[in-house]
Amino acid sequence: MRSFSFTKMHGLGNSYIYVDLFRETLPEEELPAIARSVADVHTGIGSDGLILICPSEKAPVKMRIFNSDGSEGKNCGNGLRCVAKYAYEHGIVSDRTFLIETLSGLVEARVAVADGEVTSVTVDMGEPRLERSAIPMLGPEAERVVAEPFAIAGGEYEITAVSMGNPHVIFYVDDIQKAPVTTLGPLVEKDPRFPEGVNVEFVEVVNERELHFRVWERGSGVTQACGTGACAAVVASVLNGKTARGEETVVHLAGGDLTIVWGHDGRVRMTGPAETVCTGVYYYRGGRNG
């Protein structure tokens, strides 16, 4: 049996198993299997996936994320806040503002600290990409997808698509409690019009400063929160005239609230909590199948 030390953390209920690769070593070829194993609620630890906290040549720390199905993701807003908290509290960084490398590029994080503990994290999520080719979604590459008709499973909808370094598609609903997250979500995620798959968000507009939000995440299914998805929802709401550019919007997720602003400088900034759940040692047999 092999083993490694882990920390379980969550951002608004979006939980991952975090492994510090400044101190641990995991075989690259086994990472998808390890992610599937630790995510299993019955035979593993139970989480939405695996996040590696890695050395970087471009920043003080690098984040790699593996979904619960073993696929590697490019970005995760809730994960970034947890990585920032871990890096500061474990001495990987000493400054309260620092860069984190992701597969989507470099991200700036700023931690708020009280009595040595990180209480909240603000992450500069960068500029959204809106052209169809950046999502990616089939169709005219340079066009934006804003309130575009979308037919699926016998229904007619309107969608807005946003890339926050990973793909998102937003559906507006009148009642978030009745949103077809588990029925429409998986169908849209794997729809061939999205060649790399897509995260599917359902949004109810409360007012121009508040949104209710539910998500079906690509590779993970229903989760309590999705930071990049909440950012995409705010961008989509500005594009559709439902919220205001440059103003803070509170997004109510199943796991709690995020405060997000799409600034006039083009950048999206997200503020929210990050929590440590537990630490431990995980035992596994090794091999590509776990």
UniProtKB/Swiss-Prot annotation:
InterPro entries: DAP_epimerase_AS, DAP_epimerase_DapF. Substrate binds at N14, N67, G77, N78, N166, N199, E217, R218, G227, T228. The record marks H168, E217 as: Could be important to modulate the pK values of the two catalytic cysteine residues. Pathway: Amino-acid biosynthesis; L-lysine biosynthesis via DAP pathway; DL-2,6-diaminopimelate from LL-2,6-diaminopimelate: step 1/1. Pfam families: DAP_epimerase. Transmembrane segments: none annotated. GO terms for cellular component: cytosol. Keywords: Amino-acid biosynthesis, Cytoplasm, Isomerase, Lysine biosynthesis. It is an enzyme of class 5 (isomerase). It catalyses: (2S,6S)-2,6-diaminopimelate = meso-2,6-diaminopimelate. One of its GO terms (molecular function) is diaminopimelate epimerase activity. It comes from the Bacteria. Its EC number is 5.1.1.7. It is found in: Cytoplasm. The active site is at C76, C226. Its main location: cytoplasm. Homodimer. PANTHER family: DIAMINOPIMELATE EPIMERASE, DIAMINOPIMELATE EPIMERASE, CHLOROPLASTIC. Belongs to the diaminopimelate epimerase family. Catalyzes the stereoinversion of LL-2,6-diaminopimelate (L,L-DAP) to meso-diaminopimelate (meso-DAP), a precursor of L-lysine and an essential component of the bacterial peptidoglycan. This is Diaminopimelate epimerase.
